[in-house]
Amino acid sequence: MTDTVIHTESATSKYVNVVEDGTELRVHYNDTGTGNEALVLLHGSGPGATGWANFHRNVDAFANAGYRVILVDCPGWGKSDSIVCTGSRSDLNARVLAGVLDTLGIGRAHLVGNSMGGHSAVAFALSYPERVGKLVLMGGGTGGPSQFVPMPTEGIKLLQALYRDPTLENLKKMLNVFVYDASTMTEELMQTRLENMLGRRDHLENFVKSLTANPKQFPDYGHRLSEIKAPALVIWGRDDRFVPMDVGLRLVWNMPNADLHVFGRCGHWAQWEHAERFNRMVLEFLRR
């Protein structure tokens, strides 16, 4: 165990150039910790999302446990270049991640993905199985429909509405169903998220253009999940109003080496809502 260190976004902020379909993209990432094993954290698709915003309650625990922690801003989010995606968003993210790891000289990594990040981690595992250590998937991963909840879900409808009309009122509507306990969504947190969102209107506009060009940005990988042999920990919020819990069950049913943990009193953001328990659980899984 290394000494306890507090890691900051500004001190760990870096960039790398990656070529995607003939276009050079400037990709932002945070890189901290000095461990030999790399742990990549992949964020969700909400307006204003970034690697750091999604995982700031987890970085210290993982880095201080001896991992090199890399938080990637996917193209179209955070400080990375914007892009219009007309194909599979998750396969795009997987290719970009492979390029980032190539540039950093990292051959193999553990992946932790929330929502879109979970779906992108599955896409990466399908395309680059030899480069995956272990997988942790929260609130995303298959792209398939729920058997019990009409799609798109309440949360996804609010997310898409926020992209089209990025106001504080619409942000509050989305974040209030994002987590189980809406009182944890402080005014300060909402204001920071609003500033992140409005600071990159090109991201918002290009996401809407992407949806118009291809409404199915996240394909259904259900029929291929059995190909993923890497050990996987699937974590879900019982009260997730974005991606229902039965979608997570598909991962466990179809991936041969997957375990499942369900947090009660938890929405779509398990790594934030139950950060301490989540951190312990992930570290125990990685050390097996």
From Swiss-Prot:
GO cellular component: cytoplasm
Record site feature (Transition state stabilizer), residues: 115
Positions annotated as active site in the UniProt record: 268
E.C. numbers: 3.7.1.14
Pathway connected to this protein: Aromatic compound metabolism; 3-phenylpropanoate degradation
GO biological process, one term: 3-phenylpropionate catabolic process
Pfam families cross-referenced by the UniProt entry: Abhydrolase_1
Keyword Cytoplasm among record annotations: no
Disulfide bonds: none
Stored Gene3D superfamilies: alpha/beta hydrolase
Superkingdom field: Bacteria
Keywords: Aromatic hydrocarbons catabolism, Hydrolase
Domain (AB hydrolase-1): residue spans on this chain: 38-274
PANTHER family given in the database record: ALPHA_BETA-HYDROLASES SUPERFAMILY PROTEIN, HYDROLASE
Subunit structure: Homodimer.
Protein name listed in UniProt: 2-hydroxy-6-oxononadienedioate/2-hydroxy-6-oxononatrienedioate hydrolase
High-level lineage: Bacteria, Pseudomonadati, Pseudomonadota, Betaproteobacteria, Burkholderiales
